[in-house]
């Protein structure tokens, strides 16, 4: 029953990363796994502000319009205990643009695709929404996520897109993350609620999520 509201994400030296642990080559799930568990750190740089990303590209000034929302999301993530990294494309499967890892509680963005502000924001909002889903499931210190919005609230376009893109068991979480990824401030507000410790008062848990939270002593 819980698979419909909660899911477990399957999902070096100081100078050099231990990339010898990558046994199946770059651009593989193996390479991404090495990055996610922080055994591969070379060309995986923590982001402290939007400038750490925008300065990597020739069109730096084009990012100005998204600076406030990006930096506010980043600040909320840091308050929660989540870090954001800009990583070389070799650590990602082909066409994979970013990931939130529920175990390490970090977001990784693929440097290959972050050169356009609108793409960066879609990814930051999308992966940030998964972080908020992690918060909704009790705490980021477990590996569970829960949907934040009632499924009927998600616009059909994002539901259909998720059904065409993700395995069926992931659709509830991915549909609302698709929605958040393309909605200004939606993720920012959810992350701020999490940082304030008011996730379950600002976003009413679904009945099954509430049951889970109560059974695990997260709510009275």
Region roles according to the model:
Residues 108-123:
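Short pre-active-site segment immediately N-terminal to the catalytic Zn-binding motif
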Residues 19-38:
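Short N-terminal segments immediately surrounding and downstream of signal-peptide cleavage
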């Amino acid at each position: 029953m819980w698979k419909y509201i909660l899911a477990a994400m399957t999902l070096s030296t100081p100078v050099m990363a231990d990339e010898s642990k990558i046994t199946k080559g770059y651009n593989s799930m193996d390479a991404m796994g090495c990055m996610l568990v922080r055994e591969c750190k070379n060309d995986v740089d923590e982001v402290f502000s939007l400038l750490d990303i925008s300065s990597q590209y020739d069109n730096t000034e084009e990012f100005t319009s998204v600076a406030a929302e990006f930096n506010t999301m980043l600040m909320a993530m840091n308050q929660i205990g989540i870090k954001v990294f800009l990583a070389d494309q070799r650590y990602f499967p082909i066409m994979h643009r970013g990931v939130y890892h529920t175990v390490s509680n970090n977001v990784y963005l693929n440097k290959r695709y972050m050169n356009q502000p609108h793409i960066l924001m879609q990814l930051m909002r999308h992966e940030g929404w998964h972080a908020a889903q992690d918060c909704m499931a009790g705490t980021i210190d477990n590996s569970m996520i829960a949907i934040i919005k009632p499924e009927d609230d998600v616009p059909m376009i994002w539901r259909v897109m998720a059904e065409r893109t993700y395995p069926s068991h992931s659709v509830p979480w991915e549909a609302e993350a698709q929605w958040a990824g393309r909605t200004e401030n939606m993720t920012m507000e959810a992350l701020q609620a999490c940082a304030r410790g008011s996730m379950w008062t600002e976003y009413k848990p679904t009945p099954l999520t509430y049951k889970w939270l109560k059974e695990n002593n997260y709510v009275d």
